Amino acid sequence: MARYRHSRSRSRSRYQRRRRRRSRYRSQRRRYRRRRGSRRRRRRGRRRGYRRRYSRRRRY
């Protein structure tokens, strides 16, 4: 049983690492897309996005 548990935890850590990398790439792409948007819309979205990013960094 212990052996099975160990293998499971190992696979989970690997999956977690991959997930983090993917989320980072996705957020980057979204930012680029927003920048291309209209100026008025960009200002509003940028402020909201910055707040979210700051909170995430603090948590980390």
UniProtKB/Swiss-Prot annotation:
Testis. GO terms for molecular function: DNA binding. Keywords: Chromosome, Developmental protein, Differentiation, DNA condensation, DNA-binding, Nucleosome core, Nucleus, Spermatogenesis. InterPro entries: Protamine_P1. GO terms for biological process: chromosome condensation; sperm DNA condensation. GO terms for cellular component: nucleosome; nucleus. It is found in: Nucleus; Chromosome. Residues 1-60 are annotated as: Disordered. The keyword DNA-binding applies. Protamines substitute for histones in the chromatin of sperm during the haploid phase of spermatogenesis. They compact sperm DNA into a highly condensed, stable and inactive complex. Belongs to the protamine P1 family. This is Sperm protamine P1. It comes from Phascolarctos cinereus (Koala).
